[in-house]
Amino acid sequence: MQNIDQQELDKFEKMAKSWWDPQGDFKPIHQLNPLRLSYIAQQANGLTGKKVLDVGCGGGILSESMAKQGAIVTGIDMSSAPLQVARKHALESGLHIDYQQITIEEFLQNQTALFAERGEDEKFDVITCMEMLEHVPDPSSIIACCKQLLKPNGVIFFSTINRTLKAWALVIIGAEYVLKMLPKGTHDYDKFIKPAELLHWCDEAQLTCLDMVGYHYNPLTGKFWLNKDVSANYMASFRIQS
């Protein structure tokens, strides 16, 4: 059984055409992307020449920005329409990004033989999985696969939403209904993930947390910022336990 939720895929299929419209359904991601790109590059000690896997890449906003910083990017997703948008936009942007419609579990299976033949160098220096864990039935499986695809000294990044009343008020009521930053029904509160749950799954996968930050939005300025408050949206970086 594939680790996908068809209803979740359908949501993003419907929104695919507006993926690269900075004023469309994905406006918050366009606004957030420079901040998260900077965080990823800082935590990973730069992206130039590094092999990067973007899990749940969607229409390619993060994938393209990492490629522009010199990363060798592979993006995987199970939504066909967003991937078509991603491929077209990368072509128009003159970027080579390997986009594949595949689950991470299947991708890992395909890569395992390559690792056995060519060694650890075929693994990834950086893996990103942003705003994706809260949209799948089994987040722990995604995390375990990411670990197996990572080089020994690589860095993994996860971002998701805390399961708190504050997150419900800000992300669902505020962003979807009041500010209309996101289409209604984009998020399901029951699928939000507490930091303790993320840390537990990562520990099971033998990953250790390097850093965890919350990111916050000011609707008056349209700007995001980072701090240590992880009561709503947050992201974290991990390495393989030594």
Swiss-Prot record:
Pfam families documented for this protein: Methyltransf_23
Entry EC number(s): 2.1.1.222, 2.1.1.64
CDD domains listed in its UniProt record: AdoMet_MTases
Residues that bind S-adenosyl-L-methionine: 36, 56, 77, 130
Annotated keywords: Methyltransferase, S-adenosyl-L-methionine, Transferase, Ubiquinone biosynthesis
Top EC class, one word: transferase
Entry coiled-coil feature ranges: none
Signal sequence, start to end: none
A biological process from GO: methylation
Recorded catalytic activity of this chain's protein: a 3-demethylubiquinol + S-adenosyl-L-methionine = a ubiquinol + S-adenosyl-L-homocysteine + H(+); a 3-(all-trans-polyprenyl)benzene-1,2-diol + S-adenosyl-L-methionine = a 2-methoxy-6-(all-trans-polyprenyl)phenol + S-adenosyl-L-homocysteine + H(+)
Entry GO MF terms: 2-polyprenyl-6-hydroxyphenol methylase activity; 3-demethylubiquinol 3-O-methyltransferase activity; polyprenyldihydroxybenzoate methyltransferase activity
Pathway noted in the entry: Cofactor biosynthesis; ubiquinone biosynthesis
UniProt-listed SUPFAM superfamilies: S-adenosyl-L-methionine-dependent methyltransferases
Disulfides per UniProt: none
Protein purpose: O-methyltransferase that catalyzes the 2 O-methylation steps in the ubiquinone biosynthetic pathway.
Annotated family: Belongs to the methyltransferase superfamily. UbiG/COQ3 family.
Record protein name field: Ubiquinone biosynthesis O-methyltransferase
Lineage, top ranks: Bacteria, Pseudomonadati, Pseudomonadota, Gammaproteobacteria, Pasteurellales
